[in-house]
Amino acid sequence: GTSKQYISQIIDSNDIPSLGESMLIASPTGSGKTSAVIKMIKHTSMPVIYVTNRKMTLCQFKKDYIKASKGLDVPAELLDSISLGENIIAITYQELAETTYKYKGKKYLLILDEVHCLLEDANFSVYAEKIIRYLKANRDNTARIYLTATPDAVTPVIAEIECESGQEQALF
């Protein structure tokens, strides 16, 4: 049989979108999307905002990031007390919605993990609407990486966010 291929084997860690550009990484759960993104974070000089839907996913990202960047295996109960570094913020979509004013007009690499969860909530959630408005208003000063295991539900909304900017999307 064929061996399983991971996203980090396909996407080079230098394939980071530039300001005003975006990338959609759509692949199954367990294919290494987070590992690939962690490698990208380590290779970028841009400040990073990693956003996801749940505290559990956020804790797992922090744990994986600290292990990959510092070689430490941190117990979950200590994750909140350990800094990821001055150049990286890891928050939930709800936290981003409540604090978009802090990031308006600033240059960031935005990593939107489990983006299907945000966009599925878009019709009945004020915070999803607020984030979509933020993304549209800050296209030129941010680079965006969208991560999902279920692209069919989100591709039209991502296209709506991105295509007004006149930038082409790289779809993986």
Region spans (language model):
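N-terminal helicase ATP-binding lobe
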Residues: 1-172
